C-alpha cells in the first residue's frame, strides 16, 4: 500500500506527463520543432536585413528589417517609400541574398535601382495583371524557400480581378480588403517558415467625414495592420536645395509598430534624387548627435583636427576620404550599441 502511494504521481506530474505525450504526438504528426518549450533552447538574436540607413537600423532596435516577418512601409506620395524598399533589396543582395520585386504599379525604374546599388541583372521582377495574380506569384516565390526578400509595390495597385473585368462605374466595396485578408492568412506562416522578409509598400487615403482625430488611413483594409510585425511611416520634412534647384528631401521615418523591439522610435535622413539615402549625410548628422564630430558655429572637427566649415564641405571631405568615413561610421555604430 505504501509502495503504491510512493509511485502515485502528483497532479502537476500527471499534467506534465500528459503534455509530454501530446507534444510527442504533435512532433510525430507535424515534424520536429512544431512545438517547443521556450526555455529548452537559447533564443538567437533576430536575423535582419539592413535598411541602408544607419539611423533607421538603430530605430528598428534590431539593426534592420527582421527576417521571416511582414513589413509595411507607408506614407504620402513621393515620400521615399519605394526608395526605402529598393535600399533593402540592395543590402540583401550585398550579403548574397536573392530578391524579388512584384511591380503591381508597373512603374519600376531599373536605372534608379541600379544607382541605389541593386544588382538588377539578378533581381527577379513580376508585373502582374491583377491583385490575385500578384499575391499568388508572391506566395509561390516565398514557398520556394529560395527568396530572401520580396517587395510588393503597392497594396493600392493590387486590384481584384472582378474589379478589372467589371465596368468603370461598378461598385467594388470591400473586394480589395477581402483579397488582402485571405492572402495574408495564407502567406504569414509560409513567410515565417521560409525566413523571408516580405515588404508591402502602401499608400495613404483620407477617410470621408472624420471630424476629429486623424483622417488618414492606409489602403487594403485592416488585415495588413495586424499581420505586419513592423510598420514604418515615412514623411517629407523639408526639401534639400542646391541654389534654387531641389535636389532631394529630408525625410523622417517613424516606427509605428514593432513586434521585435520597442516601437515609436524615429530616424531622419536625406534622400537625394537619383542617389537614394545619403549615407555620408547621416554620418555627419549622427556624428554630431553622438558628439563624435564636434560642431562649433559652422566649423566641424574630429579629434584634434578641424574637418571643414559648413555641413556640405564636411560631406565633400568625407566623400573624398572613404577611410575617415568608415572610421566615423564604426564609432557611430559603437555609440549606438552602447546606448541600447
Curated annotation (Swiss-Prot):
Location (main, coarse): cytoplasm
Keywords: ATP-binding, Cytoplasm, DNA damage, DNA recombination, DNA repair, DNA-binding, Nucleotide-binding, SOS response
Matching CDD domains: RecA
PROSITE patterns: RECA_1 (PS00321), RECA_2 (PS50162), RECA_3 (PS50163)
Gene Ontology molecular function, alphabetical: ATP binding; ATP hydrolysis activity; ATP-dependent DNA damage sensor activity; damaged DNA binding; single-stranded DNA binding
Domain of life: Bacteria
Disulfide bonds: none
InterPro entries per UniProt: AAA+_ATPase (IPR003593), DNA_recomb/repair_RecA (IPR013765), DNA_recomb/repair_RecA_CS (IPR020584), P-loop_NTPase (IPR027417), RecA-like_C (IPR049261), RecA-like_N (IPR049428), RecA_ATP-bd (IPR020588), RecA_C_sf (IPR023400)
Protein name according to UniProt: Protein RecA
Record GO biological process: DNA recombination; DNA repair; SOS response
Family that this chain belongs to: Belongs to the RecA family.
Binding positions for ATP per the UniProt entry: 75-82
Localization: Cytoplasm
Reported function: Can catalyze the hydrolysis of ATP in the presence of single-stranded DNA, the ATP-dependent uptake of single-stranded DNA by duplex DNA, and the ATP-dependent hybridization of homologous single-stranded DNAs. It interacts with LexA causing its activation and leading to its autocatalytic cleavage.
CC terms in the record's Gene Ontology section: cytosol
Amino acid at each position: 500500500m505504501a509502495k503504491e502511494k510512493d509511485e502515485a504521481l502528483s497532479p502537476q506530474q500527471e499534467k506534465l506527463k500528459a503534455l509530454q505525450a501530446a507534444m510527442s504526438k504533435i512532433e510525430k504528426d507535424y515534424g520536429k520543432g512544431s512545438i517547443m518549450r521556450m526555455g529548452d533552447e537559447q533564443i538567437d538574436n533576430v536575423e535582419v536585413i539592413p535598411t541602408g540607413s544607419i539611423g533607421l537600423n538603430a530605430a528598428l532596435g534590431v539593426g534592420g528589417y527582421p527576417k521571416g516577418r511582414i513589413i509595411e512601409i507607408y506614407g504620402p506620395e513621393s515620400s521615399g517609400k519605394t526608395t526605402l524598399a529598393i535600399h533593402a533589396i540592395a543590402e540583401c543582395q550585398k550579403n548574397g541574398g536573392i530578391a524579388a520585386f512584384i511591380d503591381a504599379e508597373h512603374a519600376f525604374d531599373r536605372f534608379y535601382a541600379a544607382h541605389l546599388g541593386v544588382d538588377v541583372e539578378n533581381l527577379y521582377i513580376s508585373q502582374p495583371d491583377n491583385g490575385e495574380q500578384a499575391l499568388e506569384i508572391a506566395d509561390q516565390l516565398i514557398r520556394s524557400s529560395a527568396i530572401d526578400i520580396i517587395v510588393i509595390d503597392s497594396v493600392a495597385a493590387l486590384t481584384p480581378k472582378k474589379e478589372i473585368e467589371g465596368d468603370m462605374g461598378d461598385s467594388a466595396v470591400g473586394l480589395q480588403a477581402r483579397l488582402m485578408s485571405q492572402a495574408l492568412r495564407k502567406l504569414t506562416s509560409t513567410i515565417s517558415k521560409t525566413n523571408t522578409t516580405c515588404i508591402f509598400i502602401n499608400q495613404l487615403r483620407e477617410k470621408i467625414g472624420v471630424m476629429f482625430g486623424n483622417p488618414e488611413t492606409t489602403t487594403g483594409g485592416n488585415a495588413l495592420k495586424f499581420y505586419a510585425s513592423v510598420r514604418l511611416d515615412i514623411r517629407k520634412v523639408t526639401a534639400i536645395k542646391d541654389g534654387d534647384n531641389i535636389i532631394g528631401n529630408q525625410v523622417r521615418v517613424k516606427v509605428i509598430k514593432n513586434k521585435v523591439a520597442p516601437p515609436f522610435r524615429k530616424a531622419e535622413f536625406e534622400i537625394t534624387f537619383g542617389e537614394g539615402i545619403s549615407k555620408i549625410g547621416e554620418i555627419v548628422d549622427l556624428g554630431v548627435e553622438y558628439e563624435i564630430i564636434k560642431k562649433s558655429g559652422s566649423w566641424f572637427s574630429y579629434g584634434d583636427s578641424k574637418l571643414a566649415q559648413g555641413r556640405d564641405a564636411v560631406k565633400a571631405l568625407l566623400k573624398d576620404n572613404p577611410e575617415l568615413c568608415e572610421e566615423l561610421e564604426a564609432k557611430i555604430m559603437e555609440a549606438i550599441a552602447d546606448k541600447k
